[in-house]
């Protein structure tokens, strides 16, 4: 709703009140049907929340388990959204509201941005043109340092397997993804 006129804000609030729109983050709404009609509504909500965070805070990128999830690496359990700041500042937690879409309920959450390890800004990669995350290499290292042993091992094996599948300097010789 940033930059929206008061008329547009009232219209958004009215649609949200009627249940046509669902507030996913302060100032960000999503069509309720996009959540309720999707076969995996949790994924829709997570991606929408992540997109809202990155739109409002462009210095935050997905990292750790969230980046592993974006890369399609196997995680043994669900994790809260994990973001890292690429600036020198340490932003305060971002509070996301609870979401009610039809009969579906998603709890409110606070996303706590992390500072990069060793003070170096992580390398970034863009997923599907929209969501930014750490590179696969940094994601594997971050997960190895932050997840429990078993889950870290699973993510590391899958990440290293993915890295071994593609040879940047010999693209024509690489196996098809």
Model-derived segments and spans:
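Short gly/ser-rich loop at a beta-strand->alpha-helix junction or flexible surface loop bordering the NTP-binding
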Residues: 1-176
